[in-house]
Amino acid sequence: MGEIKRIGILTSGGDCAGLNAVIRSVVHHAIGTYGWEVIGIQEATQGLMENPSKAIALHRDNIDHLLMMGGTFLGTTNKGNPFAFPMADGTVRDRTEDIIAGYRQLGLDALIGIGGDGSLAILRRIAQQGGINLVGIPKTIDNDVGATEISIGFDTATNIATEALDRLHFTAASHNRVMVLEVMGRDAGHIALAAGIGGGADIILIPEIPYRIQSVCNKIRQRQAEGKNFCLVMVSEAVRTELGDQVKQIQQFGEDRYGGIGKYIAEQIAQRTGAETRVTVLGHIQRGGIPSPFDRLLGSVFGVAAVDLIAEGKFDHMVAWRNRQTISVPIEEAIQTYQTVQLDGTLVKTARGLGICLGND
């Protein structure tokens, strides 16, 4: 490995809180400790496709305000597969070589990529093809990246979902209503389960546990019989019935995305129990806003650790969090495993111990 003089950093995939804390940390440590230059690549790999590349020099005197900012000031994208990138003329083209050329044009010696499992898989494939020295940092509100106990963005998203449930609690009790809250998470129920327990949900539905609508309605009837005429239902967007049925929405270009399950569950509850029911879809509110103190801390820790991995020449690795410590794991390990809720884990046991219905009672 040659001497490191200039590194790049980019954010890829969906945004979340805590990304700017990572960028700030990388800049402070790379410049202050090692004397390297740091280049921020804008709009993920799409910034490297441009000629010249879309990038800015980052300095310690222009990044301190980033710590408490949500989103990513570098910009990001979760659209446009670089291996089959849609062109203006309607065709698709593999832009891998353009991305590699952009990396070389900037004179980078290493690259820090902040992303979820999909983004890290793409970056790794490009790095292997182009000989790019890559270090990964996991981020996703879904907390589904393998090999790490937690990813950047999850804590803030969970806090937001918990606060939403707190607010719905008061209006549900005031009107004797069933309030259904739909949250993100893709095929992992981490947000729904953690926020549901923290926010006092009576029913929590997650993708890992197929639900029966009759079980849900029985819980509501039980509460009614006990004189509790309101109910809080937390629903993860990708939940499925015992037959595997899910609710999805068709988006532009025919792509389907999770969404609409909250409305469906609310309608079923109203029809079967007669309870006045309302639904709230939290949506992208979970991604935005001021990062939680823990996401600021985790972002700062991950940024320093990623820079140290570069200094050690430990490429094709990702920073991970285990037992309240940072470790490094091969990126391949992280993208080949998918972290879902463990059915015999502490949170599921806690939910059942609290009498929370998980849809299969």
Curated annotation (Swiss-Prot):
Gene Ontology biological-process entries: fructose 6-phosphate metabolic process
Transmembrane segments: none
Keywords of the record: ATP-binding, Cytoplasm, Glycolysis, Kinase, Magnesium, Metal-binding, Nucleotide-binding, Transferase
Keyword Chaperone set for record: no
Enzyme Commission no: 2.7.1.11
Cofactor: Mg(2+)
Reaction it catalyzes: beta-D-fructose 6-phosphate + ATP = beta-D-fructose 1,6-bisphosphate + ADP + H(+)
Position of the signal peptide: none
Pathway per the UniProt entry: Carbohydrate degradation; glycolysis; D-glyceraldehyde 3-phosphate and glycerone phosphate from D-glucose: step 3/4
Family annotation (Pfam families): PFK
Catalytic residues, chain numbering: 142 (proton acceptor)
Residues at which substrate binds: 140-142, 177, 184-186, 237, 278, 284-287
Record-marked site positions (Important for substrate specificity): 118
Positions annotated to bind Mg(2+): 117
PROSITE patterns in UniProt: PHOSPHOFRUCTOKINASE
Cellular component GO terms, alphabetical: cytoplasm
Cell compartment(s), UniProt: Cytoplasm
Major location category of this protein: cytoplasm
Top EC group: transferase
Binding site for ATP: 14, 79-80, 116-119
Assembly, per entry: Homodimer or homotetramer.
Family: Belongs to the phosphofructokinase type A (PFKA) family. Mixed-substrate PFK group III subfamily.
Protein name: ATP-dependent 6-phosphofructokinase 1
Gene behind this protein: pfkA1
